């Protein structure tokens, strides 16, 4: 698995999602980049990316 996790959102919601993710998962993330409808999360390690992916899926 790569260090990247992408989250697709409803248009206009990615900025808020990115901000919340960055605050709550700061220790696992190297960077968070968002546009209007998607959030790209770059994890510090592949393990962190996998954990982040699983945690985000649990919210669905």
Where are these regions (language model features)?
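Short, charged, intrinsically disordered terminal tails
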Residues: 52-60
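Non-DNA-binding regulatory cores of transcription-related proteins
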Residues: 1-53
């Amino acid at each position: 698995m790569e260090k990247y996790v992408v989250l697709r959102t409803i248009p206009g919601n990615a900025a808020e999602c990115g901000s919340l993710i960055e605050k709550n998962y700061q220790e696992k993330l190297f960077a968070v980049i968002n546009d209007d409808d998607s959030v790209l999360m770059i994890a510090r390690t592949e393990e962190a990316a996998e954990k982040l992916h699983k945690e985000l899926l649990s919210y669905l």
